Curated annotation (Swiss-Prot):
InterPro entries per UniProt: FAD/NAD-bd_sf, FAD/NAD-binding_dom, Fd--NADP_Rdtase_type_2, Ferredoxin-NADP_redctase_2
Cofactor: binding comment: Binds 1 FAD per subunit.
Name of the molecule in the record: Ferredoxin--NADP reductase
Keywords on record: FAD, Flavoprotein, NADP, Oxidoreductase
UniProt cross-references to Pfam families, sorted A to Z: Pyr_redox_2 (PF07992)
Enzyme class: oxidoreductase
EC numbers, comma separated: 1.18.1.2
GO molecular function, one term: ferredoxin-NADP+ reductase activity
Keyword Flavoprotein: yes
Enzymatic reactions: 2 reduced [2Fe-2S]-[ferredoxin] + NADP(+) + H(+) = 2 oxidized [2Fe-2S]-[ferredoxin] + NADPH
Originating species: Albidiferax ferrireducens (strain ATCC BAA-621 / DSM 15236 / T118)
Length: 354
């Protein structure tokens, strides 16, 4: 049932509750701007939680290693003082500029806002994994065919076939081979060629494990499957030699990456290049003043799709929004190490130096 109460009036609506969207809450909070956050998933964390909650992340500054789940939990703890309101399980479907300069925003569940600014932190847009194109195979999805790993324990002691040549395929193959509670009975990696778009160290480790007969790597493409009694029993793999072989399995994991789908964002009248939102690099504004884009959803010369790059973009976007939200206020750069004002906002005591 749609909710047609008066719109929620706010300074900022953030679209996306992944790591970058969460950090946007923090940067706005330091400027005393409260935000409402909308995400299509039922929980925060975005791609980190949906695709690799237990995979290690090594490139967050001052954090040698953390999982996607830990990063999300730490960000939620970091933004807690700012009291953001979250609206999960709904997608922003309508964005309309009003005569007073604000934006009318409505979600798929009928939640409505009047906001001075919008921050799009929607990652690659809707989560649409690239699927394995084999007729009939889709009937096994979520029973024996998976495009993501939510709980590694579900695959312990299974005969796994993993298809893909990127970081996700290699990382999960290595994870399921190593000793531990999630160790698989066997792991076979399949990729269409003997070359990978993955970390060289991971590729080297995979080859080392293959030489030690702890896993297998097959060059070829999945062209069919075998089933018995409604169970997937094997896949047909055609090699470069043209020979098709049957590879037995219990579970098939496919990691072909995500197919970017902007969804309703594509209808908001913003400049788009290669399914991403064009922004300036001064304040990460889109072609519509008052709408900003941060993280993987944006594109600009030199863009790197890294979490730490998204964090940097959040800071400049927050400062860029201040003249729109509070044009009468002068904004001075302050530091969380020394500013009593920021300490008050964060709910911490100011240090006393002798």
């Amino acid at each position: 049932m749609r909710n047609h109460q008066d719109p929620i009036e706010t300074d900022a609506v953030i679209v996306g509750a992944g790591p970058v969207g969460l950090f946007q809450v923090f940067e706005l909070g330091l400027l005393e701007i409260k935000a409402h956050v909308v995400d299509s998933l039922a929980y925060p964390g975005g791609q980190c939680i949906e695709l690799y909650p237990d995979k290690p992340i090594y490139d967050i500054p001052a954090v040698p290693v953390c999982t996607g789940r830990e990063l999300t939990q730490n960000l939620l703890k970091q933004i807690a003082p700012f009291g953001a309101t979250f609206h999960y399980g709904q997608e922003v479907t309508v964005v309309e500029k009003q005569s007073d300069g604000r934006f009318f925003v409505e979600t798929s569940k009928g939640t409505r806002f009047l906001s001075k600014t919008i921050f799009i932190a929607a990652g690659v847009g809707a989560f649409q994994p690239r699927t394995l194109k084999v007729d009939g195979l889709e009937v096994f999805e979520d029973s024996q065919l998976f495009y993501r790993v939510r709980n590694p324990a579900d695959f312990a002691d299974k005969n796994l076939v993993i298809v893909g040549g990127g970081d996700s395929a290699l990382d999960w193959a290595l994870d399921f081979v190593k000793d531990g509670p999630n160790k698989a009975a066997s792991v076979i990696l399949i990729h269409r060629r003997d070359g990978f778009k993955a970390a060289p160290a991971s590729v080297a480790k995979m080859r080392e494990l293959c030489d030690a007969l702890e896993m297998q790597f097959i060059v070829g493409q999945v062209t069919g499957f075998e089933a018995q009694d409604s169970l997937l029993t094997g896949i047909k793999v055609t090699g470069a030699d043209g020979v098709t072989r049957v590879v037995p399995l219990d579970v098939l994991l496919v990691f072909f990456g995500l197919s970017p789908k902007l969804g309703p964002i594509a209808e908001w009248g913003l400049d788009i290049e290669r399914k991403q939102l064009k922004v300036d690099t001064e304040k990460f504004s889109t072609s519509e003043p008052g709408i900003f884009a941060v993280g993987d959803i944006n594109i600009y010369p030199g863009k790197k799709k890294l979490i730490l790059s998204g964090f940097h973009e959040c800071a400049l976007a927050a400062f860029g929004a201040m003249p729109i939200i509070s044009p009468e206020k002068k904004v001075f750069l302050q530091y969380t190490t020394t500013s009593p004002k920021l300490h008050k906002v964060l709910g911490v005591e100011s240090p006393v130096f002798d």
